Amino acid sequence: MAILDINEIRAILPHRYPFLLVDRILEMETDRIVGIKNVTFNEPQFTGHFPDFPVMPGVMIVEAMAQTAGVLVLHSMPDRANKLVLLVAIENARFRKPVVPGDTLRMEMKIIKRKASVAKMAGIATVDGVVVAEAEVMCKLADKEEKPPAAPEIKVPAEAAV
């Protein structure tokens, strides 16, 4: 039985199809959350990744983990309608096995450090009890009215440009 269903998740996260990557929340504590994503062949990334061997891109697995973390951060906030959880860092990401259509991706995230508006979380993603990915993500709580911070401009010397 789900603690949060898709409609409750949609009330918490701003993501929408095709980028809402959490279908249900199964467990939630103060510093830990478990969510699932049912991976289906109808998702747009499988058109090109890869046509003859559809595999969920690793970055989308990490995004699903980060969205699960975002539910934990935003769930108990009274003014969450005015907040966003921005992914600001990914560390120690490892992809162990491919995730394919028909899989149920289970994401478990735990807060390992929290300071003011920033939370660092460690997580694993599994399919049928087998670890398929792991990563640490850092999320920043921001007001929706704030413009997201831009990446610093990188200056490439003219002679190094391709």
From Swiss-Prot:
Taxonomically, the superkingdom here is Bacteria
> What is a single Pfam family found in this protein's UniProt entry?
FabA
Keyword Cell wall biogenesis/degradation applies: no
GO terms assigned for molecular function: (3R)-hydroxyacyl-[acyl-carrier-protein] dehydratase activity
Q: Which CDD domains match?
A: FabZ
Tell me which residues this entry annotates as catalytic. Answer: H49
EC number, UniProt record: 4.2.1.59
Localization, per the record, is:
Cytoplasm
The cross-references to NCBIfam families, in alphabetical order and at most eight, read:
fabZ, PRK00006.1
Name of protein: 3-hydroxyacyl-[acyl-carrier-protein] dehydratase FabZ
Q: Which gene encodes it?
A: fabZ
